[in-house]
Amino acid sequence: MANKINKSSISSSQHLLTKRSTIFWIINSCLIFFFLFMPFQSGLLNGSQPNYEIDILYSFIIGAILLLCLGIYMYRSRRASLVHNPFRYVIWSIPLIYCISMIGAVSAHYSYIEFMIWIFYAILFMTAYHLLRQSDGQQIAFYIYMGSASVIVLFGMMNWFGNASLWGLFPWEVYPDAAMPSSGDVRLTSVFQYANTYAAYLIAFLFACLFTIVVSKNKYVVLFASFMLVPALISFILTLSRGGWTTFPVILLFVLPLLTFSKQIQALFQLILALIASVIMLPSMNSYGLQLQQDHTQGTALLAWIILLGGSLVTAVIAFAFQKYVATRLEQKLQSFNKRKLVMFLIPMLGIVAGIAGAFLLLGNTGFTKLLPASIGDRIENINFNQHSVLERGTFYEDALSIWKDYPIDGAGGGAWQALYQQYQNNPYSSTQVHSFFIQMLVEVGALGMLALFLTLAIVYYYFFKSYLKKTDDEKLMPSIWYIISTAILIHSVLDFNMSYVYLGALVFFSLGAMLSSSEAKTFLWQDKVLSNKLTIVIPAIFIVGAAVYLIMTLVNISGYHSFNTVQKSIQEQNVQQSIEQLDNAISRNGDPEYIDYKLELLTRTYESTLEEQYAIEVQEILDKMSKQEPYYENFIFRQLELNRLLGNDEESAIVSKIAINKYPWEIDYYVEFAKTQFRRAVTAIGEDDLQLANEYLQSIFEIRDVVTAKALELELLPDAQLQGREFGITAKLAMPIGQAFFVLGDYVQAASYLALSWDPAFDDNDDVMAALYYSAVLQKLNQSNEEINNTIFAAFPDTQEDLSAILDGLIGTLPINN
């Protein structure tokens, strides 16, 4: 007979995650360190570069410690922990699918890193779930979030006022763009160095402050939240984020229904109060900020801070007085009205009407925006669907869906968009992010991954709302904060890559775990049997062993990074063999393709200087191996072309260039390389008197020209507001081999028209001299003056004038191959 649950033993076990517990303080210390310190590592952007990756790896150490603490807690209180919501484990389905997607991933390394990141998210989710079931945990987590968000906001304003170093105490060398120049404006970006993501973060913080003001009973907390509301709102405006401005009212509609009708009135009063104060202060904040970034003076900076902090303090006092003296009476008068069904949706509905009116006021020809600083007013007036950021996002999404169609079930693995987008892109833009979290995830883990994500979100939000409606007002504050954070960032992430910042991703999944922790699940049918079974040790054991494995994997990767860093710093002080051995050590521990590319560069340079065949052989062996592990890492194509050039293997170069053109149809450099290779092959064939073969090579150059011309015409069909992206068409570099081909064939008029494009008197490219000589020769053949060109060439290279003159005479004397 199954043993019944011993509720007293379950209750007594809860002390393991309260203030009396060592585990409790270890977990909170890790959370304080992560949420307060790690955002200053560029927000932990997953930027697919070693200098970004190392900070993410250090965060995984925190994750391993948290997972170990969870394992110990769940082992020592396994009977208590098992009566919790069993659906909390659904979060692990997402990293599981990322693991599955690694099997056929287009990038071995970046799919591995993404898998590790999602394990970290799952750990934060589980940590929040267990920690915030205790009131002590709820309170400390709330203070950690509000404190860290306030630091980020104030740090942003420090940068806006021209100096965040605290009088030289912190150099902040990684934050040159915390206030970022953009298209003639300056946009506030704080630690994220990306205005749109900072706007999403600020939306969450703004609404968290609003809820705290109207719900919290702690007067000091209310004062603090009221004080931070104005700096956060001013910062939000200074991001100049049109996406943030347009999603703000949408998120407000998702947030307000959590409050009773009377508290919605209070929240709107506080928001309008802060908005009025912000608009009053905005002209001086804007002008002082722009001035201080150009010329920082202590007196002006002090004045700017006095205005900001003074205005915030006055607003906080008014907000506090309203809550103390007006809100209480408002609650009493509307007490019966609050209980009516659906009344909480009344103000959101009115908000939609107000939003339409506000949009007309701001976007219509009303002159209202003239009251705002010019940079902000112009930005608002330019909000429409026919602007480059909107059109480009539409292109990204369309191209991403094309990728997904080829990898529909489990996706192409982590980092797939960055690896594949150039093969599918509609025009030659450069973007390593899809600018939509959900679509990027669809590309990475396909339908299975999206199913796991939406299942997780559905479970969290279902249980959250189910329990939220039963809570008293005093019990609603903490759950509401985590709902606001996750909802605000996820909604904004539909249109941007906020979740590529691991810090924000961790915050979102911590918030989701916290939301689930506020709910209660019914006892499941087989609970008694599970609690009485020895299998209760399985999950704690998996967590403890998993923590050890996760930590080891992380430390190995960190060790590889530092080995690579050591090689880079000491490359001039040691011989090639020592550097290669250290690189091999780094690569064996961390297979970042950038490490491998650095080794290829070192081997190639060594072969070029020594001509020792062993180095060329090793380069080719590595490239053959990488063609399977990292087939879309573009630098490896350049390394292969470079090796072929050094080996004089033009036939292989032509093959590689053609393959590259198929993979990267909008990368003009591969067309150039193919054309240059085919011209060299034509010259070789002429020297061997195989004129038919030479003609075939030359004709292939014209075919490539026609392909490029046709594709360039496609770009003319883009909407006027959409940017083309990278240069594409008959560029100066491509014009040279085309002109040379016409020159060899004796069509000097055509040759001159193309070689004129490649003529560059700056001579800042290796091919510029030969292009100039060909252009001079073709002008001579057309009986046109080439004296100015010759004088320019010989003046630029006086030491080799005789050699250059001999080459020029040889070209002038060359007869067309068709004669």
Task: Give the label of every model feature segment.
Residues 1-100, 109-113, 133-139, 143-146, ...:
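Transmembrane signal-anchor hairpin modules in multi-pass inner-membrane enzymes, especially those
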Residues 99-102, 140-178, 233-240, 277-286:
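Hydrophobic alpha-helical transmembrane segments
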Residues 108-130, 143-144, 172-175, 200:
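Aromatic-anchored transmembrane helix interface
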